[in-house]
Amino acid sequence: MSDARWAEVEEDVAAAAGHLARSVELFGAGGFAGEGLEAYKARMAFMHSMQSGHTSLESALVRIMDLLGEEPPIGRDWHADLIRRAARAIGGRPAILPAGIAEAAHETRRFRHVAMRSYGTFEPTRAEPSAAAAGVLAAGLPDAIAVFRRGIDPDG
């Protein structure tokens, strides 16, 4: 499938991987404790990079579904439904995301909710699984999408 829209998918995937890789670095750098400006910047930088990374991942998945003529999920739980659907084969297309990548995406989705709704109660120890999931996605998402693309369009 030589559809030029793959360029935007690839940009979204690269953005997701880049933001999530930086999230891992930011989490490792720490400095979250305290009420001073540096602690505030550390917390906000980590939460925003996680939010940006996951949002870029969702954008890539929606673009892929658009390319395939598949309607993306709608409704209150569309964010979770998007990952669940991408993790399974539907209507002749293979799963877009392998199980481990989908599991990590669910974790970053969960954390994005924290970043968007509960940022005042950020607890670094509770973010450890999310930072680990960000590492899984940063390392594995680009290859997972490339494998999917080759699977549906070996000549593309």
Where are these predicted regions, by residue range?
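Solvent-exposed interaction patches of small proteins and small membrane subunits
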Residues: M1-G156
